[in-house]
């Protein structure tokens, strides 16, 4: 194979790869929008990557019991190895097993990853209730965008694979943008523009495993709870109270 053909084939592969990664942006598809209304206290976290139960993250459980949020939003990758088609009963079973140690939380919003790790849903929204210390209401969204208001401030939550499918590639893009151009949270910034969100609203994402907060541009990445070759676990979550977001870190 000549050098010219090799270069052309390489360029073709790279082009196809990037079209696939950014397919939703290229076709200008919008995610399903789910409104929660007004909330005083909410916790947002992502990329927990649980194998069996949230008991694998004891420091997270202790932190949640201390904060006592009205609602917890899981912004994707709750699980590590559950990326398979799942009916309502199967989904209910694994969520009950996984979340029973925090059954005192009244409401959980779970945004699934579309491309890996999380269950593949047959519909955009599944609602269910779980028995526990209180009746826990769980709403599972198929790769949706969550919106809520806190103290007259708008917040949007997205996993991130809707923008760029592969998490490692998304993390690499953010790393290169930070290293070469000093542009932190690049994919989050791109997402805010693509989704046409208000400039004074906040966008909170996961997916890249690169934690960060930018108060000026109102961008946050939740970080992750499992170490991979590309990033160490950050042990971070976002607590929004009366319109003010705080990035909280615990040792894991």
Each language-model region and where it sits:
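Core catalytic region of metal-dependent phosphoesterases/phosphodiesterases
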Residues: 10, 35-39, 50-150
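Beta-strand-turn-beta hairpins that frame and shape the catalytic cleft
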Residues: 34-43, 146-157, 215-219
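Short, basic, glycine/proline-bearing loop/turn elements
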Residues: 41-48, 81-84, 172-180
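Catalytic core of the metallo-beta-lactamase
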Residues: 26-32, 52, 151, 157-163
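Active-site neighborhood of phospho(di)ester-bond hydrolases with catalytic His/Asp-centered motifs
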Residues: 44-46, 72-77, 107-116, 141, ...
């Amino acid at each position: 194979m000549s050098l010219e053909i090799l270069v052309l084939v390489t360029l073709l592969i790279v082009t196809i790869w990037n079209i696939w990664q950014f397919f939703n942006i290229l076709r200008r598809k919008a995610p399903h929008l789910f409104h929660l209304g007004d909330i005083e206290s909410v916790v947002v976290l992502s990329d927990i990557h649980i194998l069996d139960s949230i008991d694998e993250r004891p420091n997270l459980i202790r932190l949640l019991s201390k904060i006592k949020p009205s609602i917890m939003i899981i912004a994707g990758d709750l699980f590590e190895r559950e990326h398979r088609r799942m009916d309502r009963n199967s989904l209910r079973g694994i969520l009950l097993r996984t979340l029973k140690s925090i059954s005192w939380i009244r409401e959980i919003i779970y945004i699934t990853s579309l491309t890996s790790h999380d269950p593949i849903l047959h519909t955009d929204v599944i609602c269910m209730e779980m028995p526990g210390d209180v009746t826990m209401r769980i709403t599972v969204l198929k790769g949706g965008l969550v919106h809520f208001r806190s103290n007259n401030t708008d917040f949007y939550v997205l996993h991130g694979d809707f923008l760029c499918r592969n998490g490692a590639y998304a993390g690499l893009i953010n790393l290169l943008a930070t290293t070469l151009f000093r542009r932190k949270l690049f994919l989050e910034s791109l997402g805010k523009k693509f989704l046409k969100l208000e400039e004074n609203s906040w966008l909170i994402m996961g997916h890249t495993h690169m934690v960060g907060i930018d108060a000026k541009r109102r961008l946050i990445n939740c970080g992750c709870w499992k170490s991979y070759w590309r990033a160490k676990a950050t042990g971070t979550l976002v607590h929004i109270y009366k319109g003010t977001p705080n990035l909280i870190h615990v040792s894991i």
